[in-house]
C-alpha cells in the first residue's frame, strides 16, 4: 500500500510505499477523519499522529466520506457531491465509490500530519513549499499583514513577476470586497433608486385604486339610472 503523507503547514506531500502489510494493518477498520498513531507504522514515524483523509482502491475508485462500508457502492450523485463533477446543469449520475472504512483492498491511503514527531520525514517536514499566490480578498490581506481599517490594502497586494518573451512585468490580482469611495457612492445611488422606485410604485398603486373607485362609482350610477328608467317605463 502507498501512503500519501501531506503536511499542510509546509505545503508539502510525499508518497511512501510500504510493502509489509503488518505495518499498515493499524489503519484497517478505521474511518476517514480518524487519527492514528504513527509509531505503529514504523519507527521513522515515532511521535507522529496521522489523520486519514481519503484514498483509492486498486481499481482507482475514490473513498467517500459518509459511506460507512469497507466495500464499493453505487450512489446517485448530483452537483455539490464529492467524487462527482456534473457536465450539465441539473445532471445526476449513479457512480461507484469506495466506502470510508479502510481495508486491505486500498492501493493508496491519504494521510495528513496532525502532530509532528521527533524525527524529520525527508521531503515532507524538512522542506517548505511557498504559496504561489498571496491572499486576494481585502479582509484576508489585512489579516495576513496585520493591517487596520485605516491602512490602504492596495499598497500591500503581493505582486508576482511574469516573463513574456524578453519582457518582464509584475502582475497583481484584483482585490475582492474592497471598499472604495466609488463603491460607497454606488451603494448610496442604488439605495436612493430603490426608495424612488418604491415611492413611484406606491403612487401608481394609489392612482390606480382612485381610478378603480371612480370607475366603480360610475358603473353603479349607470346601473341605478337604468333601473330608474326601467321602473318609469313599467309604470
Curated annotation (Swiss-Prot):
It comes from Kluyveromyces marxianus. One of its GO terms (molecular function) is structural constituent of ribosome. GO terms for biological process: translation. This is Small ribosomal subunit protein eS6. GO terms for cellular component: ribonucleoprotein complex; ribosome. Keywords: Phosphoprotein, Ribonucleoprotein, Ribosomal protein. PANTHER family: 40S RIBOSOMAL PROTEIN S6. Coiled coil: none annotated. The gene is RPS6. The modification Phosphoserine is found at residues 229-230. Belongs to the eukaryotic ribosomal protein eS6 family. Phosphorylated.
